[in-house]
Design a protein with these regions (language model features):
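Short hydrophobic/aromatic-enriched beta-strand-loop microsegments
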Residues: 30, 47-58, 126-129
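Structural/interface elements that position substrates and couple domains in central-metabolism enzymes
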Residues: 17, 21, 38, 48-51
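Short, acidic/small-residue loops that bind anionic groups at enzyme active sites
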Residues: 95-115
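Short internal beta-strands
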Residues: 28-37
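Mid-chain, well-packed structural core segment of small domains
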Residues: 60-100
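Short, glycine-/small-residue-rich phosphate/pyrophosphate-handling segment
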Residues: 110-131
């Protein structure tokens, strides 16, 4: 499955720790991430990550396009609720696309862990049928 990982700057360490803890699950899937987040994940876990541009430079738009084309199966977007990009898709745009295309999305650690465990159990295999 294709898993997208995005984290605002204040959440990058949290994303790094999540990926270290669940490396054994992520290893079985294709990982996509915005530029800086992807580099952090690669450096700390050794996982192969297909990196978009940095979020502010268009990486979130690249992710949005892949969601719209139903090429992403799970999104984990650890966002800083106090941070807002004006004129960028950000979490609101990504959430809207995920809702439109039935892509599971986690925006906090608790939901991210639940999605990763569901992914490992095969609970999200129905996504394969959609592609």
């Amino acid at each position: 499955m294709n898993v997208a990982l995005v984290a605002h700057d204040s959440k990058k360490t949290l994303m790094e720790n999540l990926c270290i803890a669940y490396r054994h699950i992520l290893l079985k899937h294709s990982i996509f991430a915005t530029g800086t987040t992807g580099r952090v994940i690669e450096d700390s876990t050794g996982l192969t990550v297909e990196k978009y541009l940095e979020g502010r430079l268009g990486g979130e738009q690249q992710l949005a396009i892949q969601i719209a084309h139903n090429d992403i199966d799970v999104v984990i977007f650890l966002c800083d609720p106090e941070f807002e990009y004006v004129g960028e898709p950000g979490i609101a745009g990504i959430l809207r696309l995920c809702d439109t295309h039935n892509v599971p999305l986690a925006s906090n650690l608790a939901t991210a862990e639940a999605l990763l465990l569901a992914l490992d159990r095969g609970d999200l295999n129905w996504r394969e049928i959609l592609r």
